[in-house]
Amino acid sequence: MKCSLLLLACITTLSPCGFAAEPSTRASKPIAFDTHDGYFVSNKFEATAPTSFVALKDQASFDKVFGVGMVMNDKHHRLQPATFGTKIVLAAIHRGKAMVTYQVTSVTAEAQTLVLRYTTNSKPSESAEFACPLIISLDKGDYSKVRFVENGKKIKQVDFEPSAAAKDAAEPKP
């Protein structure tokens, strides 16, 4: 009996140290977000890439990646017209012969890096090809990078690009 109690005490004492799921060296803060749908991916945006990941700060940049898919009795949740005044948009895109759906598990901030964690579910297709986007919006902040974590694995880290207006202003005029 004493041996069993001693073993139980050891397991209870050591388990928090020995079985940590993922060591976190940075403090992370949960970030509120909203998901959006009803958009198609432009066939001019990275058309041959199997996956794409973007962080967008303005409507012009968004419009280069996505278009609105209109249908009758449309109930899609789209971005509001003035979204980019207060929000930024993050998107992950999967292309290929599978319909991919997403479930966001969390969005957190670690210093100036946003971390978007989500899971995917794929339904293969014999003939049709798809470009399936995950689109979320969140409040603007002092962020410089976004890390995309898909199904528990770090997939990609991207920098926030300058807005389309800033790019146009920076380009030399002939």
PLM segments and residue spans:
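Positively charged n-region of N-terminal signal peptides that target proteins for export
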Residues: M1-S4
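Bacterial N-terminal signal peptides
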Residues: L7-S15
